Amino acid sequence: MSLFLCLIAGILAFGIPAKADQWLCGPSFGSVNARGSDVRSIPIRLAKPETVDALIATSRPDILWRLADIAFVPEFEDAALSAMQNGASAITDLLAYDQTPDFAGRHLADMRDGFGQLWQEKLLEAGLVMLLPETGRPIDALLAAEQSAMSQQIGLWAPGQSPAYHYAGSSEIDGDLPDAARAVGRFAVIDGILQRIEDREWRSYLNFGSDWRNDFTVMVDRDLRDAIKTAGQHMEDWIGHKIRVRGMIEDRGGPYLELTNPASLCVEQSVGQP
């Protein structure tokens, strides 16, 4: 059989992989510079990690580092630490974003291997961590890595994972995601189709169902609403499209999320594009 026929047979047998979801995320919703393009790269050699969130470079053992824009979850922290211990020797450089340490004395940074891939990407692709935007830096590559793990349903995104971290904010979402009402009290990722927007002087409510008293709602305060508009986005254009948000889910009659970081809200790629 020719190579061409073999390829056709393989496609028929296994199907064509579905295209991963593409997103536009705040605060810029698409117009971004390359992550770390304005930060000097520092060559490093890492000590073998003893914990996931207190990393040490052998040249400066007095400084603790934490990987930026990701969060470790309890159920997968041991697996993440094992992966980091196995991969630490491949890390060759560091991008330090803030000279001010956090409450635990750690500095936020990106770390990359010799091929230029972020360590955070590798952990996200394996489904061992969650994306948690916090630096204001572009998250496109990190979001794509997390989406890959979601699409493959691996790690913390696996079906039946308890507790779940990915929920449906509206009935129109395809698949078997649990309802957002089950996410109350947890930090979670919620996908939903935006139904309508209620604007008030100091805030806007993004409603993902016909009854705001019971359905999933996202609150956007006036400052964030203005920032979204400044970025060239009109929230009314999002109606009927898939939205992804992440944060702590509260119970306000129905599941409710107060948006605190525009990077925690993403919209289908088609929105706002020519």
Enumerate the language-model features and the residues they cover.
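Bacterial N-terminal signal peptides
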Residues: 2-13
